[in-house]
């Protein structure tokens, strides 16, 4: 898969003192280096064997990833995020609460998947609230496209999952079509369509606020055959 159009724009946003501390003082304790010469060995990187590894692409400020890692210490979590404020925020939380089952990489997710993730090595991939690029002329920037899902499928082991969530209905329809068209996957909802929010996905403050305003959220969970 050739990466041509990026699904994100890097903006120079404000970084708080705590986020900067996360980047300066503790990032090295959690970061997987993209420029390492070979694909990552998760048993080595996490310091344990036989633990499931789940990737979250675009973890934002890390709220969901942090909660899931805390609630599931038996699993490894790898978070991919390009925005420094979010990386610093998550790392500061991981340090404060001494969470040891999370690693982060601050790099383009497509390039990470192409070069650093071994095939059939993941128990699942979660993509929560990706940028919807709601203007039609920008739809080509949306992360979730057929070619991208085909690459994800190779990295996930049989019975592993892809879990997406979005609060944009037309993006939800697009994601449903893309995932349903991939022959290596089946919809966890046997009757098709969207899934109820799994208990494993924490509700964020953003999502709770949206619910109060009557905004919908669509979850999609597909399993590799």
Curated annotation (Swiss-Prot):
GO molecular function: tRNA (guanine(46)-N7)-methyltransferase activity
Coiled-coil regions listed: none
Pfam families: Methyltransf_4
Biological or metabolic pathway of the protein: tRNA modification; N(7)-methylguanine-tRNA biosynthesis
Keyword line: Methyltransferase, S-adenosyl-L-methionine, Transferase, tRNA processing
Keyword Iron: no
Primary enzyme class: transferase
Recorded GO CC terms: tRNA methyltransferase complex
Entry binding sites for substrate: 135, 167, 204-207
Catalytic activity of the protein: guanosine(46) in tRNA + S-adenosyl-L-methionine = N(7)-methylguanosine(46) in tRNA + S-adenosyl-L-homocysteine
EC number(s) on file: 2.1.1.33
UniProt binding sites for S-adenosyl-L-methionine: 56, 81, 108, 131
Positions annotated as active site in the UniProt record: 131
Family: Belongs to the class I-like SAM-binding methyltransferase superfamily. TrmB family.
Role description: Catalyzes the formation of N(7)-methylguanine at position 46 (m7G46) in tRNA.
NCBIfam families, per database record: tRNA (guanosine(46)-N7)-methyltransferase TrmB
Protein name: tRNA (guanine-N(7)-)-methyltransferase
Protein species of origin: Legionella pneumophila (strain Lens)
């Amino acid at each position: 898969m050739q990466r041509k159009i990026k699904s994100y724009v890097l903006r120079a946003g404000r970084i708080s003192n705590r986020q900067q501390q996360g980047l300066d003082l503790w990032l090295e304790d959690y970061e997987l280096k993209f420029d390492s010469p070979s694909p990552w060995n998760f048993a080595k990187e996490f310091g344990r064997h036989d633990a499931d590894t789940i990737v979250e692409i675009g973890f934002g400020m890390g709220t969901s990833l942090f909660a899931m890692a805390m609630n599931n210490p038996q699993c490894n979590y790898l978070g991919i995020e390009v925005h420094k404020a979010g990386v610093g925020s998550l790392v500061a939380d991981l340090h404060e609460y001494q969470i040891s089952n999370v690693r982060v990489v601050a790099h383009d997710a497509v390039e990470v998947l192409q070069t650093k993730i071994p095939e059939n090595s993941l128990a699942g991939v979660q993509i929560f609230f990706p940028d919807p690029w709601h203007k039609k002329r920008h739809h080509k920037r949306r992360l979730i496209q057929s070619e991208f899902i085909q690459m994800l499928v190779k990295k996930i082991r049989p019975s592993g999952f892809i879990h997406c969530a979005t609060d944009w209905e037309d993006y939800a329809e697009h994601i449903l079509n893309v995932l349903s068209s991939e022959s290596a996957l089946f919809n966890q909802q046997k009757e098709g369509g969207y899934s109820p929010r799994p208990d494993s996905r924490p509700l964020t403050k953003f999502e709770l606020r949206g619910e109060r305003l009557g905004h919908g959220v669509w979850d999609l969970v597909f399993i590799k055959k």
